[in-house]
A protein has these predicted regions:
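Flexible, surface-exposed loop/linker segments and immediately adjacent secondary-structure boundaries
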Residues: 2-43, 47-51, 55-203
Length: 203
């Protein structure tokens, strides 16, 4: 059974921790399996070809291969995340969250978001919701982005001559509406574009 279908079936149980593991995935440096507990303060890393779907509190995540994520927060909420490297699709419940990457700080308020973190550039697609973007190396370079359906992806760079050059428009890449629907289902929600008349897309 395909990953998206398996995970969607699990949604009725409101799972927590690791829901699906493909290939080599580590929690705090140790091999992870589906069903493993995951809490704020843990780290998740994937090897080439590895990926994982997991739930922490009201938030759900899909981490792709060659990625490393550090979490922090209370026992029920991962309030602060650091994507050291790699690719992460996330959906968040209400409340403030923060994600840091090598080049950006992203303030989140009830959002679906896709991030690709590299040493010199971060890609951010606010799939829906509201985020505050800030360049790490130039705090005055900032932008608030509000979208309903992948409307305003951005690159945030490590270096730039002016604030306007630190955050620039980007295309929509490497994530799908089906993945967002699957993640939201795990925490008992639907993306706002479901039922809105907007077509589902794969980018």
């Amino acid at each position: 059974m395909p990953l998206l279908q398996r995970v969607a079936l699990a949604a009725g149980k409101r799972p927590s921790g690791m829901v699906d593991v493909k290939g080599e995935v580590l929690i705090n440096g140790r091999p992870a399996r589906a069903g493993a507990a995951l809490k704020p303060g843990d780290s998740v890393a994937t090897a080439p070809g590895g990926s994982a779907v997991f739930v922490v509190g009201r938030d759900a995540f899909l981490i792709r291969e060659k990625s490393e994520l550090l979490t922090a927060g209370s026992s029920a909420l991962a309030g602060s995340l650091r994507l050291v490297t790699g690719k992460l699709l996330s959906v968040f419940g209400r409340g403030a969250r923060r994600i840091a990457t090598p080049t950006a700080t992203i303030g989140i308020r009830g959002t679906g978001i896709y991030i690709e973190a590299e040493a010199e550039r971060t890609y951010v697609c606010t799939c829906y919701g509201l985020v505050d973007l800030q360049a790490s190396n130039m705090p005055e370079a900032r932008e608030t982005v509000s979208t309903t359906h992948h409307d305003a992806p951005r690159y945030i760079y490590a270096h730039g001559e002016t604030p306007i050059k630190m955050i620039e428009p980007a295309p929509v890449v490497n994530h799908t509406d089906a993945e967002l629907i699957m993640l939201e289902a795990l925490v008992g929600r639907k993306p706002p574009f479901v039922g809105s008349g907007l077509g589902y897309k794969s980018y």
